[in-house]
Amino acid sequence: MTTPAATTDLSALPTLSSELNELNEAQLIEFTSAAEALILQVSDVRLLQDLRVQLTGKKSPLTGWSKQMGKLSNDDKKTYGGWLHEVRSRIQDALTAQQQQLEVVALNAKLASESIDITLPARGGQKGHLHPVTMITQRMQQYFIQAGFNVATGPEVESDYYNFEALNIPSHHPARAMHDTFYFDAHYLLRTHTSPVQIRTMEKNEPPIRIICPGRVYRNDSDQTHSPMFHQLEGLMVTESSTFAELKGLISEFLEAFFAKELTVRFRPSFFPFTEPSAEVDILDDNGKWLEVMGCGMVHPQVLTNCGIDAEKYTGFAFGMGIERFAMLYYGIDDLRLFFQNDVRFLKQFG
């Protein structure tokens, strides 16, 4: 872009008298035409603004002539007023038109410099994938669905009854201390396990019942191996002939199918208020150490009774496991918090 210094030099205009009454129409027309030509030479918006001030500002010849109108006779005022109005209008119109033209030129230059070269190769599309916790959940569900179980879900905001009372955990029971619970009030809370789904299912359905209950649960705990929100998958089977031997076989087969290898599985006696007998399940790792992976047991007769099921006729077993725990073992991850930090560098490894 060229920026000639002479474009704002008013010496290019004809020299006229500073006294208005010494001018005639021809001189003013010549002045106006010269000003319009000067305006057309300006190729820079900033210089055009400078020229606007010089041609129409307080110190311009045009303003100086206009100030003398009060000294003229009425007839001269009419004559010179018409001439000066024509001069000012033409100069203002020329300035406005040139500014619009320069703005268009500047915009086109900017658009040209920012244009997209469509001949360049495009960036490849990025594919998303499931979260590792979701993939592990689906892997677990796939096994149990093939084994004849249905998937059941329930509310995450639960009543104290479904989360504790119906599961044989009364308000005075010491097992309550095992649950650092998020309470809304004395009656409602964030569920600490997915066991309430089992209660709701048994209340609404007659045996035989075969369900798994995956979902989010909440406990007031947070460290390298615990999170205030995590995922559980629990299972329940109630029939007229459910046995602990059947439970052991189901869990052992599930663990070997999940980890896709033969495992040494150990069942240790334990205690849960809602099952009797109860057991913790361990597997032997490659270093010869036992790893606790889940809990299980035969459904306590009182729990069946609470749900309106005849405990003399039916028996059942239940089991539960932490999905993040299985994900950590499956992928070799030692920090549970990585699953919840949304770090793409971590998550993209599972695509």
Curated annotation (Swiss-Prot):
**For this UniProt entry, what is the primary localization, expressed as one broad class?**
cytoplasm
What keywords sit in the KW lines? Answer: Aminoacyl-tRNA synthetase, ATP-binding, Cytoplasm, Ligase, Magnesium, Metal-binding, Nucleotide-binding, Protein biosynthesis
What does the entry comment about cofactor binding? Binds 2 magnesium ions per tetramer.
- Record's GO cellular component, any one? cytoplasm
Q: What class of enzyme is it?
A: ligase
Which E.C. number(s) belong to this protein? 6.1.1.20
- Which residues take part in binding Mg(2+)? E276
The record's InterPro entries line, in alphabetical order, gives: aa-tRNA-synth_II (IPR006195), aa-tRNA-synth_II/BPL/LPL (IPR045864), Phe-tRNA-synth_IIc_asu (IPR004529), Phe-tRNA_ligase_II_N (IPR004188), Phe_tRNA_ligase_alpha1_bac (IPR022911), Phenylalanyl-tRNA_Synthase (IPR002319), tRNA-bd_arm (IPR010978)
Reaction catalyzed: tRNA(Phe) + L-phenylalanine + ATP = L-phenylalanyl-tRNA(Phe) + AMP + diphosphate + H(+)
Q: Which GO terms describe its biological process?
A: phenylalanyl-tRNA aminoacylation
Cofactor(s), by name: Mg(2+)
The record's GO molecular-function terms, alphabetically, read:
ATP binding; magnesium ion binding; phenylalanine-tRNA ligase activity; tRNA binding
Q: Which Pfam families match?
A: Phe_tRNA-synt_N, tRNA-synt_2d
The transmembrane residues are: none
Q: Where is this protein localized, as stated in its record?
A: Cytoplasm
Q: Does the record's keyword annotation contain Nucleus? A: no
Cross-referenced PANTHER family, in alphabetical order?
PHENYLALANINE--TRNA LIGASE, MITOCHONDRIAL, PHENYLALANYL-TRNA SYNTHETASE
Identify its protein family: Belongs to the class-II aminoacyl-tRNA synthetase family. Phe-tRNA synthetase alpha subunit type 1 subfamily.
Binding partners and assembly: Tetramer of two alpha and two beta subunits.
HAMAP family referenced in this protein's UniProt entry, alphabetically: Phe_tRNA_synth_alpha1
* Protein name (Swiss-Prot/TrEMBL): Phenylalanine--tRNA ligase alpha subunit
High-level lineage: Bacteria, Pseudomonadati, Pseudomonadota, Gammaproteobacteria, Moraxellales
